[in-house]
């Protein structure tokens, strides 16, 4: 190295350090050779080698979702760059900072149809918050700093393509800087007291209020719960916000639509007033969720979101938790009401049903009993990396979460195969916490080669695989919409043996009588530093479809209700309308 000089790749790594980056995920390649040379000599940033670039991208995105620094993943020019796309799109749709670094042929080979040359930047147009190709070596650290600043400030993915020769070139060591250490904490806008007072007046006059609490209030669960108790308003929450609340809070109705609970899917149509806190319910229009709502109050930190899902009677720009506290301080307390009592009864009826399924002690193994064992043996502050489909749906129903936990997935993009990559990142940043990757066999089939990544880097996690040889969530959808259940079944492998072949510990379990002991042993081995895969061979029993309930005799025949209850083992479930009538109220949704 020439005195007073530094390679552009080494300068780039120094910039990344100012942004808190300690890990780069990826696979080495020729078009990343200058970066790999710099990483080999760097003492602070670890290169975490994955078996597929998509795993690296998703791990980097989930790193930020779990509260870590901006995640960084690299891909070779051409194939590697295309493999990063899933991570880029998940970051974009979940408003998550992420930096994708793309390798590229040397600059003198570009536009010459060289080996693996691809016009890469257009792939990310329209989705990346920053998308550039480095033009010369001195520009490299500056562009990386710009990319990180854009990703963090705009909460999305940034993409940088680097011709490989630039990274080898030397630049002046004082010709660059990184801005990641500068104070940039976002200060929420001051709340508009006029709008707060409007909201308070609306809630004071509401007869059937509901709080719809989104992820914007994930750190304000205690305040939102206190507000719920004070005004006797049940809480609907979004799927990714369950950790904000105590799972057994009597006023929690769960989430609405398909990935949800029965109570939430009923109460949303019965409420006259909705306090929409930090949420962007994507099924609102499709589901006509608020068609019976008379008054709608929305709080959001993003002015674009205000009014997106419903016409507003009070519009509050600001932090959801701060707004909830401001309303809590001013709103009138409410004694127990028929509306509240009906909701508490409905919630308990649903929990009794959940507990019955979870507590079975004999018969074929279902996913419900697996969750029961997890709840029994998981640490109180366990981290859950959750895959999509039935796993998302059922984890929100059956995991007994509290604000001590973290639960993350791909909620809007819903890309299958995200749980295992997420667990890599979660364990890397939280080495002293227990990490569970919970997924179906379809998701595990997409990413199981990276079980060995946990083994290689001593990142012990527990992989829980619900194995029933089908794409269950899609099959269930086809059951409601299609003539044929086509293309949804597949042949499974022995996942325990796959785990063992990668240096992990594998278990296979297919009996209710054995699940508790298997999970207990898996937890014990995990605490001893082992990565574990549990192949839980469950039935193909469909979880109850809360979006198409057939329980109310005013809507369905006696035969249809009987068949529905038998199919879903739901003999004790009662339609919300009957609880309302017990309290002297009439349904607004069912006439």
Curated annotation (Swiss-Prot):
Binds 1 FAD per subunit. Binds 1 Mg(2+) ion per subunit. The keyword Methyltransferase does not apply. Mg(2+) binds at residues 441, 468, 470. Keywords: FAD, Flavoprotein, Magnesium, Metal-binding, Oxidoreductase, Thiamine pyrophosphate. Residues 1-188 are annotated as: Core. Pfam families: TPP_enzyme_C (PF02775), TPP_enzyme_M (PF00205), TPP_enzyme_N (PF02776). Disulfide bonds: none annotated. Residues 189-336 are annotated as: FAD-binding. It comes from the Bacteria. GO terms for molecular function: magnesium ion binding; pyruvate oxidase activity; thiamine pyrophosphate binding. It catalyses: pyruvate + phosphate + O2 + H(+) = acetyl phosphate + H2O2 + CO2. InterPro entries: DHS-like_NAD/FAD-binding_dom, POXB-like, Pyruvate_oxidase, THDP-binding, Thiamin_PyroP_enz_cen_dom, Thiamin_PyroP_enz_TPP-bd_dom, TPP-bd_CS, TPP_enzyme_TPP-bd. Belongs to the TPP enzyme family. This is Pyruvate oxidase. The gene is spxB.
